[in-house]
Amino acid sequence: MPIMLNFSNGRILPESEVEALRNVARSNQSDVLLVGSRSLRLHHISFMDGFSVEPIPGSFLDRIGERRHRRLAESLERQLNGGSSFLQAFSQYIEQTSSAPPLQESVRNEVQSRVNSYAFSVNPGDFPCSVLHLSCPITLCVPETGVFVKNARCSKVCSLYDISALTEMLRRNASHPLSREAFTPGMIVHKEECNFNTTEQHFCILPRSDTRL
């Protein structure tokens, strides 16, 4: 059931309300918030005890006010993360916990170049799956700009990542969040090389593209 929230952009919620929201998110992992006529989705990222908030697209009038809708989500997200955006909190977490051996600069640059080349604007309607399968493993939100990444170096299963979150991981020399391996260029997959398997309910690499990777 959606949570009704009396909140507007620029308003500071009492700490008791902020903590109550955190606790609800910790219990449910994901919740829908109703702020007036606008809907937001709140996610709890348990491995770092962080919170991300994304606007849920609605009517045509909502889309006209998309910028205000996003600012509302960002304002609430900062309050839930103690003043930081989710990406800032994630960056701090990576800095504190990263223990991966440093990638050679040439390899890191090649991975980042491939990320930039393969990134695309995400339109959920283009995929034969629910938005659940389009959620970034880091932010738990559907990215505006995303890129497919293998779940492990030798895996044929892929997940969609938010390009900003992935770029931050590379900048911080963090390991792959699922396999804990160092990132390699071959882990970054072009959109056209991925197919959603409706039987197994995940994205996988098309057989004809194996030789490219």
From Swiss-Prot:
Its main location: secreted. Induction: Transcribed for 2-5 hours after treatment that induces type 3 secretion system expression. The keyword Transferase applies. InterPro entries: Effector_NleG, Effector_NleG_sf. It catalyses: S-ubiquitinyl-[E2 ubiquitin-conjugating enzyme]-L-cysteine + [acceptor protein]-L-lysine = [E2 ubiquitin-conjugating enzyme]-L-cysteine + N(6)-ubiquitinyl-[acceptor protein]-L-lysine. Disruption phenotype: Slight reduction in diarrhea in C3H/HeJ mice, no change in bacterial colonization, but higher survival rate. It comes from the Bacteria. Residues 136-189 are annotated as: RING/U-box domain. Its EC number is 2.3.2.27. It is found in: Secreted; Host cytoplasm. A motif (PDZ-binding motif) lies at residues 211-213. Keywords: Host cytoplasm, Secreted, Transferase, Ubl conjugation pathway, Virulence. One of its GO terms (biological process) is biological process involved in symbiotic interaction. One of its GO terms (molecular function) is ubiquitin-protein transferase activity. Belongs to the NleG E3 ligase family. Effector proteins function to alter host cell physiology and promote bacterial survival in host tissues. This protein is an E3 ubiquitin-protein ligase that probably interferes with the host's ubiquitination pathway and targets host proteins for proteasomal degradation. Mice infected with a strain of bacteria deleted for this gene had an increased survival rate. Can be ubiquitinylated, and ubiquitinate ubiquitin, giving rise to polyubiquitin chains (in vitro). Interacts with host GOPC (human protein). Interacts with PDZ domain of host GOPC via NleG8's C-terminal residues. This is E3 ubiquitin-protein ligase NleG8. It comes from Citrobacter rodentium.
